[in-house]
Amino acid sequence: MGERTGQRQTGYARRMMPFAELEHLPRQLRHPAVRDLAWALLSPPLLAQAGCPQRHPLQGSAWVDDPQRLGHWLATLDQAPAPLSSWLARLNSRRLGLYYESLWQFALHQAPGVELLAANLAIRDGGRTLGELDILLRDREGDHHLELAIKLYLGPPAGNGQDPAQWLGPGCHDRLGTKLAHLAGHQLTISGQPHSRVALAGLGIAEVEAQLWLGGYLFYPWPGHAEAPAGAHPAHLRGHWLHRRDWVDYLEHCPPGRWQPLPRHGWLAPARVQAGGSWTVEQFDSWLQALDEVAPAQLLVRLEEDEDGAWQEAERVFLVADSWPQLPGG
């Protein structure tokens, strides 16, 4: 019994991270969008147990049988990124979630053994929109409705970190617990509703499985300690968060490197800055002094110099105002 349980757990872990041997590839690529694409496909999910079904979008692709084939595709794209650049140029929004979805759509169009049937399919009742299905795909395991999400959450400075409701988005408008409840209670149920079945039938889909894929980072308080939220994936990506009043103390505990803020569109893959492009200590200090005391949370990255002279991300930190969190209505 124990051996079979272990085999099931190993099989589940493999299905959640089918390309674990490629986990370092994003850092080896050069083009920013290709690095983001590789990160989206290869990074671990936030949660191993989300309270609703999860599925890696490429689980039924031929790439799973030969991960090096996926690695070769990404490396080739890094040398000639025009197809990805053209695809992303169609985006009319700078929203991180839409960028993340677009990266996945590009990959699913290219993935061997996967047919992308629809993306962002609106479900309507007359003139009223009931919801939207992020991804509909067909592979060797059947037809699937997938909801995709990219999230960054900050853990509680004191209290029960195991409670997903205690994990806040940097703008305090979102909670991990609320997001999971919305996914389970609304987004993943849409494809089973009568109006959806009509739309699905038009695509030749009789039955569909609804599943989630949630990527992102969890940021732990400094100083202090928070336990990981219940169900967190053991390999989930992480950083720290701290108030501005603690910044100088934090620096004293850090290895050497160069700090600079990450623009929002750079929040996915580990940052890479070309030789000569990193901020000096003086540049960062000047930026920090000019930053408003109640500025929104800033995602900072510490860079270390590589052998080729480029600067690679070593850690990331959310720096928040001393008054954070400013909860709506608080």
Q: Which residue ranges define each predicted feature?
A:
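N-terminal amphipathic/basic-hydrophobic helices that include classical n-h-c signal peptides
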Residues: M1-R15
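Intrinsically disordered, low-complexity Ser/Thr/Pro/Gly-rich regulatory segments
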Residues: G11-G330
